[in-house]
């Protein structure tokens, strides 16, 4: 059996190990493999992390069975810290610029609303998807799924009066039928 076939049979995770002292060199700079600010809330469940958008997100909780997780979200409430990567698009031509990147017409996208969006190549191939927030005129946040989209923004921003940046925020989800009580 070839070595790459053996590698494909394995699941690779990042395990949290108590560290006393300075940050390990392998994890520097801190922008790489960064963890959600609320990750400490996951520690009692002995999480195993995977990289998603160059951010650590829990893939498996060793102290909670998959059945317990399923029923918690179906009958109760859960807080899930996700790896979606928010990108801020701002400026007088933010909506016009978004029409070049995404498939849905921004003129139909009301202020204060969210919209499921697809970023596509010129030939129609999908790059990634995510949830767009229309915060105010000239200000959009795209919480994108895993995939490299930032360079695509930069490549298409020329000629538009827009600013594309990482707003340095994280996404969390509160899910389940009892979520409105939290």
Language-model segment annotations:
Residues 2-120, 125:
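Acidic, proline/glycine-enriched N-terminal capping motif
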Residues 71-75, 127-130, 156-159:
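Short amphipathic alpha-helical segments, especially helix-boundary/capping motifs
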Residues 131-182:
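Acidic, low-complexity central loop/insert segments
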């Amino acid at each position: 059996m070839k070595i790459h076939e053996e590698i494909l049979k394995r699941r690779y995770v990042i395990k949290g190990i108590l560290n006393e002292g300075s940050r390990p060199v392998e994890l520097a700079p801190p922008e790489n493999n960064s963890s959600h600010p609320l990750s400490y809330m996951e520690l009692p469940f002995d999480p195993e992390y995977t990289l998603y958008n160059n951010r650590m997100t829990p893939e498996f909780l060793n102290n909670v069975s998959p059945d317990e997780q399923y029923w918690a979200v179906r009958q109760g409430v859960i807080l899930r810290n996700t790896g979606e990567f928010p990108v801020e698009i701002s400026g007088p031509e933010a909506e016009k610029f978004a029409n070049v990147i995404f498939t849905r017409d921004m003129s139909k996208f009301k202020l204060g609303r969210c919209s499921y969006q697809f970023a596509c190549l010129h030939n129609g191939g999908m790059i990634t998807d995510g949830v767009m927030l229309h915060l105010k005129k000239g200000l959009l946040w795209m919480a994108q799924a895993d995939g490299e989209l930032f360079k695509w923004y930069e490549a298409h921003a020329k000629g538009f009066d827009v600013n594309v940046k990482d707003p340095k925020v994280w996404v969390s989800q509160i899910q389940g039928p009892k979520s409105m009580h939290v």
